[in-house]
Amino acid sequence: NSINIGIDGNFAQWVGEMIPDVTQEILIVAEPARLEESLIRLSRVGYDNVIGYLKDGYQTWLDAGKETDSMDRITAQEFESIYKKGENILFDIRKKSEYDAEHVVGAINVPLNQINQHLAQFPKENKFAIYCAGGYRSMIAGSILKQRGWNNFVDVIGGFGAISKQDVAKTEYVCPTTML
C-alpha cells in the first residue's frame, strides 16, 4: 500500500501535507539519477526514515514481479464528451481559493490536503472523475483513493488547464484578489 508523490511537482510541500508522521517509513521508487535529489528534498522537510530505494527505480519492482496498480486517465477531450452526457460525478482537487476563482459547473471541491477527511464524499460504486490545476495533485489524490480501495474513477490529464480549453460549462472567473 503506497501513495505516489511525484518528485517533479511541489514534492516537499505535499510530502509534508500527506504524510503527517515524519517517522513514517519511506521507500523511494525513483529513477537512479533522481535518488539523491529525493533524499535531500525529503530530509529538508524532516523525513529521514528512508528504509531504502529500488536500485533501478520502478523497473526493479516490475522485474521482481511485485504487485502494481495504476489509475485510468482520460484526456480533456474525452472528459468533455463524458461531461456533456452528464454521466460522471466530478471532484475538483484544487485549493478552495482556486475552486472559488473558477471551476467546472457541478464539480465538488475536495482539496488534496483534506482528502482523507472527506473520503465519504467519494462514491464507491458510481464512476467519477478527478482533476486539479495541471494533473500533479490529482495524481496524488488518485493514488490515495486507490490505496483506500476506490477503483471507479478517472483522472483528467492536464487538469483544469486542459479542461478549460474544452466546451465545458465553467463558472465565471473571479479574480482571487477581489474575494479578499
Label for each model-derived stretch:
Residues 1-89, 93-180:
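Rhodanese-like catalytic fold shared by cysteine-dependent sulfurtransferases
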